[in-house]
A protein has these predicted regions:
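Carbohydrate transferase catalytic cores enriched for Leloir-type hexosyltransferases
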Residues: 1-155
């Protein structure tokens, strides 16, 4: 079985709880000899620099050209899926642009429901809409806590 982690959170977070969660998950997979790879062609994350070379693909960049770099990540990721042929794709955030649903299983981790609980503070932010859409498309959802699971079911 081959697991592929996408680029999203590694492109969006230099440091942070979500990227640290994935960094630790990947380290545990390595201990258990579960084949996995992070494909983040262009990333800003510092945790990913500490992964073994055979666990990652990409280069650390600065964010001067955010939109162009994000587009390139999406493009390269969809091509890499065809080359790497993972059994499972674990999405690291809530964009849902890289679906090849018929041939792969998709997993999503939901970290919290902050955007939904405090929606008045996030009026222009599309995270809630993206999260709802992606939750309806993936094969399996992991929640960080029982409380997050309860709130996700309520929304």
């Amino acid at each position: 079985m081959k697991i592929l982690f996408d680029y999203q959170i590694f492109f969006l977070q230099r440091y942070g709880g979500i990227s640290n969660y994935f960094f630790n998950l990947i380290k545990e997979f390595n201990k258990k000899k579960i084949v996995n790879k992070v494909y983040a062609p262009l990333y800003i994350n510092e945790y990913i620099n500490n992964l073994k070379l055979d666990n990652k693909f990409g280069i650390n960049i600065n964010l001067n050209f955010f939109k162009i770099n994000y587009f390139l990540n999406k493009l390269f990721f969809s091509l890499f899926i065809k080359i790497y042929k993972p059994n499972i794709i674990h999405l690291t955030y809530y964009e849902n642009n890289n679906f090849q649903k018929k041939t792969k299983k998709y997993i999503l981790t939901v970290y919290d429901m902050i955007h939904e609980e405090f929606s008045l503070n996030f009026k222009k932010n599309k995270t809630s809409i993206n999260k709802l859409n992606i939750c309806n498309r993936v094969d399996h959802i992991i929640t960080i806590s029982k409380n997050t699971k309860k709130k996700l079911i309520e929304f």
